[in-house]
Amino acid sequence: MEKTIAINAGSSSLKFQLYDMPSERVITAGIVERIGLKDSIFTITVDGEKIKEIIDIPDHEIAVQMLLEKLINHKVIGSYDEITGIGHRVVHGGERFPESVYIDDQVIKDIEALSELAPLHNPANVTGIKAFRKILPDVVSVAVFDTAFHQTMPPASYLYSLPYSYYEDYGIRKYGFHGTSHKYVSERAAELLGRPVEELRLLTCHLGNGASIAAIEGGKSMDTSMGFTPLAGVSMGTRSGNIDPALIPFIMEKTGKTAEQVLDVLNKESGMLGVSGISSDLRDLEDEAAKGNDRAELALQVFVDRIHKYIGSYAARMNGVDAIIFTAGIGENSSYIREKVLRGLEFMGVYWDPALNQVRGEERFLNYPHSPVKVIIIPTNEELMIARDVETIKQNH
């Protein structure tokens, strides 16, 4: 029995999901939190039961050792030999990695070299890769990049209107993120629609604390709302999304903050938190708006307004849309936001049923049968995409 483990390593966390392949059955999943801090938390689900331990885990290598030991202790696996593939989520692949790759020493060096494009994420991703390679050196390891799916964007979509030499010399361009999620839901939408993805025009809305929209034509990403970094695009939980770049020196002058401090504000104190002054959590804002809090209502309106701008422009970009897909925490669970986004799209041929919209986290169509444009909730499954890519590369390696 072959097992593949999908890994998402953060700076102080390690999420994992173990699959039986090729059946794609989830065997177990869990997370190690607060790595390198006192009272680290190890959580694993075994036979539907969540087991939680508080234990000191000083670094990622110890976290990986512990994870593998727990898999054996809880009889999830009989020996390490059962694990035949490891897939690692890597946030930034730049232009170097247009698809998932087998990890060797050179690939690790290249991912490290791309760290200046994703200083918060890539170093953590590499730490996870190295920890697993040290303990399971002979198992096929694969890197799956958040940016890879968007590498099909044409130059007119990814170039900024800056001196062209900035792109040539420094790699300044739109990269886009959440690619694994956009790819998964676009392929799943094609299955649900019973049509080849190659003939579809899809608008995928990955709406979570981080949010991005993508225009997917013929199974390929043509454009997406995030940019050089995940700060661009729509308003998010704490991120501003697109702003006039001249605001940065203006804010510096007015507040005495450095460029780095302003960037910190744009990343961590803006978006729905910044506008509402209450919370970055959409559920809190929905509750407050229902009680008549104007600022909470305004934060939600700004979020929806920015989503509308992308839906309109991407529909024009693809000369029409066959389906709109909602995914991720907000997209899957907030009937309120879906309703606000869908209201006013009738001109595009979107006719949706309010009764069907009262659902959380399950896969379903929201449109009336006669609606030319279909509307679908598809819970994302980035871990499964990672496991599938491992399978593909394992067969070719």
From Swiss-Prot:
Binding sites annotated in the UniProt record for substrate: 89
Organism expressing this protein natively: Listeria innocua serovar 6a (strain ATCC BAA-680 / CLIP 11262)
Cross-referenced PANTHER family: ACETATE KINASE (PTHR21060), ACETATE KINASE-RELATED (PTHR21060:SF15)
Cofactor binding notes: Mg(2+). Can also accept Mn(2+).
Co-factor requirement: Mg(2+); Mn(2+)
Any one of the GO BP annotations: acetyl-CoA biosynthetic process
Group of enzyme by EC: transferase
UniProt GO MF annotations: acetate kinase activity; ATP binding; magnesium ion binding
Alphabetic keyword roster: ATP-binding, Cytoplasm, Kinase, Magnesium, Metal-binding, Nucleotide-binding, Transferase
Binding site for ATP: 15, 206-210, 281-283, 329-333
UniProt binding sites for Mg(2+): 8, 382
Site (Transition state stabilizer): 178, 239
Keyword Cytoplasm appears in the UniProt entry: yes
Pathway(s) this gene product operates in, as recorded in its UniProt entry: Metabolic intermediate biosynthesis; acetyl-CoA biosynthesis; acetyl-CoA from acetate: step 1/2
Quaternary data: Homodimer.
Protein name: Acetate kinase 1
The EC number(s) this enzyme carries: 2.7.2.1
